[in-house]
UniProtKB/Swiss-Prot annotation:
Residue ranges flagged as DNA-binding region: 77-105
Protein name in UniProt: Zn(2)-C6 fungal-type transcription factor pigI
Localization per record: Nucleus
Originating organism: Monascus ruber
Xref: SMART domains: Fungal_trans, GAL4
Practical applications: As colorants, MonAzPs are widely used in various food products for centuries. Moreover, MonAzPs also possess wide-ranging biological activities such as antibacterial activity, preventing hypertension, lowering cholesterol levels, causing hypolipidemic effects, and displaying antiobesity and antitumor activities.
Cited function: Zn(2)-C6 fungal-type transcription factor; part of the gene cluster that mediates the biosynthesis of azaphilone pigments (MonAzPs), a complex mixture of compounds with a common azaphilone skeleton very widely used as food colorants. Acts probably as a negative regulator of the azaphilone pigments (MonAzPs) gene cluster.
Amino acid sequence: MQPRRESGGLIARFAPDIRLKSAVACLFNRASLVLARRVGDGCLHPRSPPRDRTAMADNSNSSPPASRRREKPQLSCTLCRRRKLRCDRRQPCETCVRRGLSLSCTYVRPPGAAPERIDRAQGRPAGVENLPERIGQLERLITTLMDTVQAGKTPSAREPMPADSTAAGFERAAAAAAAAAAAAAAPGEAVDAADSAAKEEEEEAAPQLSDRFGRIKIEKMETAYVESTHWTAILDGIAELRDHFRDEQNAVGSAPFPGPGAAAEPAEPDEPDILFGNYRCVSKDEILSAMLPRPLVDRLVTEYFINKDIAPVIVHSVTFLREYERFWEHPRETPIMWIGLLFGVMCLGAAFQRQRSSQMPDPQQLVRLYREKIIQCLVVGKYAKCAPYTLETLLLYLNIEYLQSEDTRVETWILLGVIVRLALRMGYHRDASHFPHISPFAAEMRRRVWALIVQFDCLTSAQVGLPRMIRDSQSDTAEPRNLLDEDFDENSTALPLPQPSTVQTPVQYIVAKNRIVAVFGRICDLITSSNAPSYPEVMQLDETLHDTYRSVPGGLQMRPMTRSLTDGATVILRRMYIVLLYHKAVCMLHHRYMIPARTDGRYAYSRSTCVAAALQILSHQWTLHNETQPGGRLYEERWKVSSLVKSTFFLGTTILCAELDCSLHKEPADAEQSPAETGLRQQVIQALHNSYTVWLQASDSSREARLAADVSGLLLTRAQRKWRPAEMRQVGNMAMSSESPFMGVSIPPQSATMASAAPVEQPLSMPQLLQFNTAAHIDYSDLGAEPLGLSQGVDDMLAMSMTFPRMFNVPV
């Protein structure tokens, strides 16, 4: 009885809750009885067989004779049998391990079976030598949980054991563990105990979905939360990667996919001055003194309107040019907010500068100067009072902040929150048709600005992994009309009829994108809700999303680069932004069902759709990467690939990493698979291989790119070790098929540029070799661009690159 006294001491020390105390006491008492009954002088006491209920029934006069039908042996564990789940018949089975119910995994012993079930994983009788270890494991678990409660912290509901952190959850965990401990003593009692422990578990939603409460990180200098659909939360859900990458600065450190751990640390961008007070209070005259001569200002204004896609529909070009002329005539009489708007236009124009001349100062220096002047104009004009041009100036400033960093910045989201609240204060969430004193021109411009704010809110909130700030029920503002700036101005008494939907305008793009954003926002609301959505709700939103994308005008529908020969860079990028948003919405809607779909056919559509969308995302990433290289069609527009766009690529990368991680752990290397599954795995590896190349090149200037390169490189290395080298070489030579093997979801063929840049076993030219060694900083300037004449393939060259001098600038 000594174990009972020890357990009582533990209970008295760590059990402040009466329900928890009773659960723990019950657990240790039952475990102690089992130990006392089973463990003697180093051997097991004989057990009496369980009572035969059928024989007892025969002795009763009122009972009918027993059925002569032969009982079907139960091969699955008790919990899998009750839930009708697939069981691999191990001890414990994989399903119970994944659900955190390892200690509750018990089997009903058929008549005449061997006295003990052998644990195939350990090669020893389960429940005999393993019984003290189970009790010790349970004691350590409860001690840890009680320490957490005693420290005043609420244990996370996402920890593997127990299933939840409430007192009821502790009771269920204790009952389940006691049932496991009693399994070896009496099979009949074990079944009853396991059934009672599983009753409350059956009430939980099936299948066991991925965590929908997100991830929270609490550190000394920072506390951060992201929703479960954020790419970092998905990455954190891969346990092996979570342990390996506790710090994103860790390197992969293994061939043939070396991580960029030796690269220099990216510099921290400046924080938004308007949020943190990093500005000087100056007068209006001092602000005007920073204005450049008009010819140089004209050049910057022209640059802005030529490249207006980064900040569309904020400024009405016709009206702005009239006000621009009046400003040069009477600069001191111009409202300070309009001057801030002009500095915003000039700042973006300087950021867009592609060519530098002796007459134009350094554009980067101008960006810093004009960024400061925008803040000073907003402060002098008291932006909280919401004077005219306030929101327009703030939106230009928001675009400037997006260009300051290649990584996600929560400060930008906070700045957007200021803009949203000012827009609500100015009534932009109510359609101007309710207010007759607002002119048709002002009403239409308010609709344009509000549409842009709604879009920024939804996309930026998803980028930082938080719920959006604007709800659909709070606004009735109509869509802006498809009008050119030349169609109306401030003198218009009524708005003209809109242009046909096939006419490509900045407003057409905003309207088409916002219709997908509206469904995207509903998806974000559904998956960030505290109430778990039902699968029919998910499928209904899936259908709405597909219908909305099909309604996008044909000119904005994505098409291969080979069919876009006559289209400009602006049109190509608009198509790509829309299709990336569509695929991102698909991934966010379905990714929680990817793992359950492997054992439950009801969710096969979600897995196939999510993986196909992620493959599409990385296919577009590879196309965009190649077209923005020197000589590519989008090279001059490469700066438009902002952190908002890259966040979609991060999501696609992590989803395919999760898919590959499941294949690495669930599928034996020599397992027979269908051609569809093998083809899908090859597509996933090929897509991650291409994505790894992109992230590796960007890792010098982006922390997020470095983390993505580390993760994808680690998984690719493990995939190469597990599967046959011949299959991996086949992956290196393959191009994505035109049809996905899943559910008939089409995967577009790679462009000619993409196919030519894909890894193939051909002699490598010097630019191709440098593509895989950007972090090495090796000077190859004295070598020509002719082929090296090597017979090695890309995988061999990647392995060789580990011996290159990565920390030294050594000429070759």
